[in-house]
Amino acid sequence: MKDYTRNDTLYKRLLDAAGDDKLPVLDNKTFESMNAEYGKEEMRKNLADYIATERPVFPLKEITEDNMRDSFNSLKNFNTNAICTPKDQVDKEVFEKYDDYEYSYDKYGLGLINGPSTYNDVSNYFMQDLRLECGSYGFRAPKEVWENGDAYAIWKCLGPIWRGINDVKLTKVKDLDGNESEQLLGGKLDSKSYISAFRLGTYIATQFKPVVAKAIYQMTNAKTVLDTSCGWGDRLAGFFASDAEEYYGCDPNPNTYARYTQQISKYNKLLSKPKKVTIWRCGAEDLPYHKLPPIDVAFTSPPYFSTEEYNKGGEFQEDQSWSKFNEYERWRDDFYLPVAEKSMAVSKFLFVNIMDPKIKGKRYRSSDELVNRLKDKFLGQIGMRIMQRPKSDKLFKDDKEKADFMNKIFIENVWCFGDKNFDLFQNSRKANLDEFFAWQDL
């Protein structure tokens, strides 16, 4: 934004293009003509100035209550066996973030859960605004930048609108006299293009897939479940869509705690028989474990050390693990490992979704440390598939290398502990031909 001077005419056109929410919306024809008239840099700077000055409403994804209800019913009726594959029936190479885990998938893998994001609206309906306000160490959240950032911070986020995510291309065109020039063609300015740009320029807290939570509750035949980090309510949503009957959990964030009440009320109205839910507003280190009944599966994705800054600047910030345990050894020894031990002590199974955090270039081996602490209960790990996309075709020497990369299955780790005589994939295991003919001969 160096040497920037507001173009009053352009700024006025942005004002005129906005509705009650103050968000400028330009259709393709208008967007192209304004790019041609003012140039992309002038457009970008004035748009950044406009957002910083007028503070339009942040363009959240539109999710109606009908969308949420349809998503819930679809998730409830979905057979999660379809997304669970035992290791011996996985036919592609599995790729972990780190290749030197002491308990790697190659040696200790049990199988895969390949859950789609299809059902994310079931919880995102309640939580997306809070999730988009949650930043990380060194990275601001999109909603926070939009609402509080200066023009330069916003300008940095807007660049992708003119760089491909918006179908904008620098195209050679000829005028009526045959003179050739390059123009920016394609694209538009709407809610989707704004949020797509801000996704690339900021940090967005991860949403856990409710369908994966349901799969884990189903594969363990769980009736009572424990979640020591309720987070964005995604595992709560998976619980309501599963056959489980009682959910116990905790979270120190007062903002999400209020939303859990809304989730519980809405979901129970969609069921013929209401489910029992008890959630404490506290950190997992302060959970009254003695008040819990016997738990079938404790499944959580704990707050990684120094990663997401939940409820920063809000009420009870001091109760968050990132604030309360601000050194790795304290986080590990006073929070992470004791919580895992206490959860295992009251549960038949313990499933923990965590990867080693890396802060300022230093990797902390949280995964191996967890397994070493609970080694006598360790079953192995389940790979939770994530979608991996290469940053640039320039990373690959040829199309074959790119195809090989894209053909791998990238995973996050779910570390599993509990009953060693239980086959977690028994309901999704496909019989081979030998087993089929052996059964036919009986």
What are these regions, as identified by a protein language model?
Residues 1-84, 92-93, 100-113, 131, ...:
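Class I S-adenosyl-L-methionine-dependent methyltransferase catalytic core
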